[in-house]
UniProtKB/Swiss-Prot annotation:
Organism listed in the record: Xenopus laevis
InterPro entries from the UniProt entry: Myelin_TF, Znf_C2H2C, Znf_C2H2C_sf
Zinc finger (CCHHC-type) residue numbers: 394-437, 438-481, 788-831, 832-875, 881-924, 934-977
Protein name (database record): Myelin transcription factor 1
Acidic residues: compositionally biased ranges: 86-100, 244-273
Compositionally biased tracts (Polar residues): 487-499, 634-646, 690-711
Ranges of biased composition (kind: Low complexity): 570-595, 670-689
Gene name for this UniProt entry: myt1
PANTHER family: MYELIN TRANSCRIPTION FACTOR 1, MYELIN TRANSCRIPTION FACTOR 1-RELATED
UniProt keyword annotations, A-Z: Activator, Developmental protein, Differentiation, DNA-binding, Metal-binding, Neurogenesis, Nucleus, Repeat, Transcription, Transcription regulation, Zinc, Zinc-finger
Cell location: Nucleus
């Protein structure tokens, strides 16, 4: 290839320098016999100019080189390489030197050189030529690849020192006998890689470390040379297509890990430092080299190839990979690829580690290598075939790789807008993931840190991430390594670069911003080997929280350490103090941590400092998580804030937290306030001159950062007291026990809280012995209603140990009932009912269960009581109660019923919810005397029923009622009927002699007498009226009977008249009166009237005609009988 084409690829190169072994020239002769090699040479000579213009994908080009490592021919040639002699290597080096001399511009290489290069460097040369990166690749490969390039330069020094130690190459040969042009070529390559990584950040590399390859050669052997070359060519052709698909999938994972690039500056500085050391070993590195790209193929290490081990973000394997065989590595690599979790980086590292092992074992003969090669070839070929079939681009499974969340199209993901991701990380629809898919990805897509379950990560509380970004365990290990470097500066000068490679940090993690909290000195921490650290981290982190197994066996006497409050000093300033055995301190700025072990016979520091350092560092970072459920055996800590102090908290046998204040008073000299160690039966007396750790003698160890600014090594010999920073403990012995541990606001006055605590502790001294841990006495309960200034402190859940979280009604501490409290159980309610007799439901036999307003026994009304409804009790005022409005008022003197919790009305007859009662209760508590509103009702009227003391009434046990309503004795007497009305009234007046001096009562009695008299008069009038009404009713009945008789008579007369009229009509039918028609029923009345007039006025009818008419009428009427 001409120089112009080479110069075009100058600024984009692979991250590894090619190493051409000493037998390169001899191998070229054997490569000419390979038909594929000859065909590639012919194609390459025709495509020299087009190749310089085309910009292929860097991943595809890198894969061509990558699988030279996995090919069996390359591995076999490396085994054969060490058998070649030093003299032959030096002779070959001279030939390489001649080939690598600078040529003039536009001068083509000789045909022999072109044949040699094209036969042996078919794919490497293509890669070097085609690595012009496209613009999208520039954004992807940036500072992360810069670190990899620097690490390669550092590791190149490891190989050189290994050769010197084994005797294969003398130091004089390394320093003096190297050709000047070859050494200048390597120096130029290293310098360009470092400079271009910093300036342009476009160093192109494969997905993992596949370009970190050995280009090895072997001596010309009569048996197997040509077949091995053919295998190498065929494997390269076969695996090239497979790895393209595989790399495309792994490219997606790199997108998730790009956010870690800017967090790896510390590691970059270390690698650059090692690179400078490597450059110092080359005295002639300043010589010019006009062809750096071409000379990159001719490295000045004739018999040793560069072995690279780079840990990436997806590497979860330890250094134990170097102990496995090549066959096992191939099997495990395929298994990892099928799971879709590990990329090619683990494969390359494992294979390189195995090759290092083979190179360092010169006792193995060439014949054994040939046998192993033939066996590995047969075993690896089926694996390659399976790889090809699995990652075939034409298969539908390849195209269907997308987010496993059902219904997710890739939008809204944290890692970007694309549907082809294969993990649950960053998916906004993770709540819709079925348990089967979640379980399938739980063991595959998780944090690569050994022992990490995903909890405590900075970015999220999930176990599906596949990077070490934000991993607290990895961060703890990084802190430990940095402490080791600063605490043991002498060991670093003695250790070789090989040991630095082995102890390379397993991850690039985020730096904890601890220095902002004050004077943080990491050189106090000890050195912890990574093997022990990983083992301890895995031991302490694999415990899962099973809510189903929440019982007294696991959580009994579990300790909680509240957060340490600040005092005179700044709350953010602290220093880390070392332990006596150089254990790593806890670097969390504001929290204390306790490690509880299940063993009760272990001493305070009975485990090694490595385990302690690993656990304390991991615990410190895990507690930085926003949501981290502590494990039951290793992280039994929980942070709680108090305004001025912290309380001693304990979990009893029932699994409930105990925040009561009436216990452990006599142990105040044993336990400091900042930590709870109540599971330990005995403790040493705390040192009173310094802040100390509370170390349990039997079950727990606790470390905590604090605000002290000075520390001595001998201060750690005894337990440390954190209770009184910068002052003596004897000054304030009463402040050990706070009022209650809650999330109260800092607005509460500290002095007022201390006074309340002291008052309460004085009242509770009589309740200390033989008490249930969750006791709530009347005094304790009524302290919830103290001053308005401490409103947020007092309005908390009355359940002992409840901080308000987990309630059905919400996560707040301001509720004042047990309703919805997850920690309130039946035994606790019964216990509270036993100690608060006046805070019960007034219904007889009601324990408070089944109420509409909640299942608790602290209610004091019949509202919602199911038993009150069943028994038919009425809570409405009766007639006698309504007569006197004074009976409907609050019994507390001076209360008008306003401001009551239960409502703004005056009809209640108890002190429940009365603000005046609460205020006087507070005054009584501050004065040292218990307050009871019943004492205000001893004077006054009592029940008027003889022998009744007020008990057993339906409306409550009160002495203030002045009526017979609800009195069981009065109702019993009324049912028997033994007391008449007059006797009852007389008894009423007799029992009212106590109130004779009351003018109001006298006036009422007088009015009652007047009413009685008027009632008597009205009753007499009513009797008279009733008699009159009776008389009138009798008269009315008589009249009605007479009317009936008359009606009957009238009816008989009408019948008779009808008969007469008919007879008259028949008789006078033939007689016609003048000027009248014959008689009929229609004119009967007129005919009768005319006849009557004729007989009345007979004088007018004296003429003969009229006389004859009258005679005829008389004759006709004679026959009619009336």
């Amino acid at each position: 290839m001409n120089v112009d084409n080479v110069n075009k690829g100058t600024h984009t190169r692979s991250k590894a320098s090619r190493v051409i072994p000493s037998d390169l020239i001899e191998q070229e002769v054997s490569l000419e016999s390979c038909p594929l090699s000859r065909k590639r040479k012919l194609q390459e000579s025709e495509q020299e100019n087009p190749l310089s213009k085309r910009k292929s994908h860097p991943l595809k080009l890198a894969l061509d080189e990558g699988f030279n490592v996995d090919s069996n021919g390359s591995e076999e040639t490396e085994m054969k390489e060490r058998d070649s002699g030093t003299e032959e290597s030096e002779a070959t080096l001279e030939e390489i030197e001649e080939d690598s001399e600078p040529t003039k511009p536009k001068e083509a290489p000789s045909p022999q050189t072109a044949e040699a290069e094209s036969s042996d460097k078919v794919e490497p040369e293509e890669t070097e030529t085609k690595t012009e990166s496209s613009p999208p690749a520039k954004a992807t490969y940036s500072s992360y690849h810069e670190i990899i390039a620097n690490s390669l330069l550092n590791l190149g020094q490891v190989a050189k020192e290994a050769l010197v130690s084994e005797g294969h190459l003398k130091e004089s040969e390394l320093n003096n006998e190297k050709p000047t042009s070859v050494k200048s070529g390597q120096a130029e390559i290293e310098q360009l890689m470092v400079e271009e990584a910093c300036e342009k950040e476009i160093i192109i590399q494969t997905e993992d470390a596949e370009e970190v390859i050995e280009v090895t050669s072997e001596p010309i052997s009569e048996s197997g040379t040509e077949p091995r070359d053919e295998v190498n060519c065929e494997d390269t052709e076969k695996l090239q297509k497979d790895m393209i698909d595989e790399e495309e999938e792994e490219e997606d994972d790199d997108v998730d890990e790009e956010d870690d690039d800017d967090l790896e500056e510390d590691e970059e500085e270390e690698e650059e430092h090692s690179s400078e050391m490597a450059n110092q070993d080359l005295p002639h590195a300043s010589q010019d080299s006009p062809k750096p790209h071409c000379e990159g193929h001719f490295s000045p290490k004739p018999e040793y190839s560069v072995i690279v081990e780079v840990r990436s973000d997806d590497d979860k394997d330890d250094d134990s990979h170097s102990q496995k065989s090549a066959v096992t590595d191939e099997s495990e690599m395929y298994d990892m690829m099928t799971r879709g979790n590990l990329g090619l980086l683990e494969q390359a590292i494992a294979l390189k580690a195995e090759q290092v092992k083979v190179v360092r074992e010169p006792s193995r003969s060439s014949l054994d290598n040939m046998k192993n090669f033939s066996a590995d070839e047969k075993q690896n070929r089926p694996i390659d075939t399976m790889r090809k079939s699995f990652y075939d681009a034409g298969r539908p499974e390849k195209r269907d790789i997308k987010c496993p969340t059902p219904g997710c199209d890739g939008t809204g993901h944290v890692t970007g807008l694309y549907p082809h991701h294969r993990s649950l990380s960053g998916c906004p629809h993770k709540d819709r993931i079925p348990p089967e898919i979640l379980a399938m990805h739980e063991n595959v897509l998780k944090c690569p840190t050994p022992g990490c379950t995903g909890q405590g990560h900075v970015n999220s509380n999930r176990n599906t991430h596949r990077s070490l970004s934000g991993c607290p365990i990895a961060a703890a290990e990084k802190l430990t390594r940095s402490h080791e470097k600063q605490q043991q500066p002498g060991d670093l000068s003695k250790s070789s670069s090989n040991s630095d490679r082995i102890l390379r940090p397993m991850c690039f993690v985020k730096q904890l911003e601890i220095p902002q909290y004050g004077s943080y000195r990491p050189n106090m921490a000890p050195a912890t080997p990574r093997a022990n650290l990983a083992k301890e981290l895995e031991k302490y982190s694999k415990v899962t929280f099973d809510y189903a197994s929440f019982d007294a066996q696991v959580f009994g006497k579990r300790l909680l350490a509240p957060k340490i409050p600040s005092s005179e000093t700044s709350p953010k300033a602290f220093k880390s103090k070392p332990f006596p055995k150089a254990s790593s301190p806890c670097h969390s700025p504001s929290s204390s941590y306790i490690k509880s072990t299940s063993s009760s016979s272990s001493s305070g520091f009975d485990y090694t400092h490595d385990a302690e350092a690993a656990h304390m560092a991991a615990t410190a970072i895990l507690n930085l998580s926003t949501r981290c459920w502590e494990m039951p055996e290793n992280l039994s800590t929980k942070q709680q804030d108090t305004p001025s102090k912290s309380s001693e908290i304990e979990v009893d046998e029932n699994g409930t937290l105990d925040l009561s204040m009436n216990k452990h008073r006599k142990r105040e000299s044993t336990f400091p306030s900042s930590s709870s160690c109540s599971s330990s039966p005995s403790m040493k007396s705390p040192d009173q001159s310094q802040r100390q750790n509370c170390t349990s003698a039997t079950s727990s160890n606790m470390t905590s950062p604090h605000s002290s600014q000075t520390s001595r090594q001998d201060d750690w010999d005894g337990p440390i007291d954190y209770t009184k920073p910068n002052r003596q403990r004897e000054e304030e012995p009463e402040e050990m026990e706070p009022a209650a541990a809650s999330f109260a606001s800092s607005e509460v006055d500290e002095q007022e809280m201390q006074e309340m605590q002291e008052m309460q502790e004085m009242q509770e001294e009589s309740y200390e012995d033989r008490k249930y841990p969750g006791d709530v006495t009347l005094t304790n309960f009524k302290l919830k209603f103290l001053s308005k200034d401490s409103k947020k402190e007092l309005l908390s859940c009355p359940t002992p140990g409840c901080d308000g979280s987990g309630h059905i009604t919400g996560n707040y501490a301001s509720h004042r009932s047990l309703s919805g409290c997850p920690l309130a159980d039946k035994s606790l309610r019964n216990l509270m009912a036993a100690h608060s007799a006046d805070l019960k439901c007034p219904t007889p036999g009601c324990d408070g269960s089944g109420h509409i307003t909640g299942n608790y026994a602290s209610h004091r009304s019949l509202s919602g009581c199911p038993r009150a409804k069943k028994s038919g009790l009425k809570i409405t005022p009766t007639k006698d109660d309504k007569d006197d409005p004074d009976l409907m008022k609050c019994p507390v003197p001076g209360c008008d019923g306003l401001g009551h919790i239960s409502g703004k009305y005056a009809s209640h007859r108890s002190a429940s919810g009365c603000p005046l009662a609460a205020r006087r209760q507070k005054e009584g508590a501050l004065n040292g005397s218990a307050f009871s509103w019943k004492s205000l009702k001893t004077e006054g009227p009592s029940c008027p029923t003889p022998g009744c003391d007020g008990s057993g009434h339906a409306n409550g046990s009160f002495l203030t009622h002045r009526s017979l309503s609800g009195c069981p004795r009065a109702s019993f007497a009324g049912k028997k009927g033994k007391i008449s009305g007059d006797e009852l009234l007389g008894t009423n007046f007799k029992t009212s002699d106590v109130l004779e001096n009351d003018e109001e009562i006298k006036q009422l009695n007088k009015e009652i007498n007047e009413l009685n008299e008027s009632n008597s008069e009205m009753e007499a009038d009513m009797v008279n009226l009733q008699s009159q009404i009776t008389t009138m009713e009798k008269n009315l009945k008589n009249i009605e009977e007479e009317n009936k008789v008359i009606e009957e008579q009238n009816e008989a007369l009408f019948v008779e008249l009808s008969g007469l009229s008919q007879a008259l009509i028949r008789s006078l039918t033939n007689i016609r009166l003048p000027q009248m028609e014959p008689i009929s029923e229609q004119n009967f009345d007129a005919y009768v009237n005319t006849l009557t007039d004729m007989y009345t006025n007979q004088e007018c009818y004296q003429n003969p005609e009229n006389k004859a008419l009258l005679e005829s009428i008389k004759q006709a009427v004679k026959g009619i009988k009336v």
